[in-house]
Amino acid sequence: MTVYRYVRLGQLAARKERGTWRVAESALELFQRDDGSDTADAVSRRSAPWSDRLSNRLLEGDSTGAWKVVEGALTAGLEPLDIYCDVIVPALERIGTAWENGEIGIADEHLATMLVARLLGRLGPSFNRRGRRKGVVVVAGPQGERHTLSLAMAADALRAGGYSALEFGSDMPLAEFERQLRAWLPLKGVCVGVLNGEAVDAARQMVAAARRIVGPTVPVV
């Protein structure tokens, strides 16, 4: 395997400068310790640092390389839901922490987020199950909430479980949320997602409204 391919797979950290990939000596030493070869056994491949590899590609704006990392993890035996929970989410957390610490700029964080949205779009169909659905679950975020990736991943997890997930996205007005709940009754569940601390009160209002509308026995989370 060429050095270029190791870079595109996220196994060797590098930065692109004026059309040329440059590898720091520390990154090369780390790569040599980890031994990124393809001859490792299945257990080693499953436990490879996939999330670190992905975050490297995301921060470089490398959509092709990011997808190759995902493909590599799937080939190693990870399930699509594992990719969400053990690869994508930790990669986003790492990037978010880097932004909070001033190590990267907001543009870098936004670039990574948009690339992840594209990854979810490609992975999404793999969560669909054949056969009859168990019922409908509404997934939405309250007004003031701007994050949508977590809602999309939750909806895909529900689809993998055999449910029809209705994604209404984030920043959902309460009155419209209530209207949609009534329109889709009976429901099997309601999922309200919030990451923004300033939107917590709005999320509580959504949960309370959902409980009134769907009744005491339907899960509202």
Role assignments for model-derived ranges:
Residues 5-7, 164:
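Compositionally biased, intrinsically disordered low-complexity regions enriched in proline and serine
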Residues 102, 118-221:
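C-terminal regulatory/effector modules of DNA-binding transcriptional regulators
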Residues 2, 9-129:
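Long amphipathic alpha-helical segments
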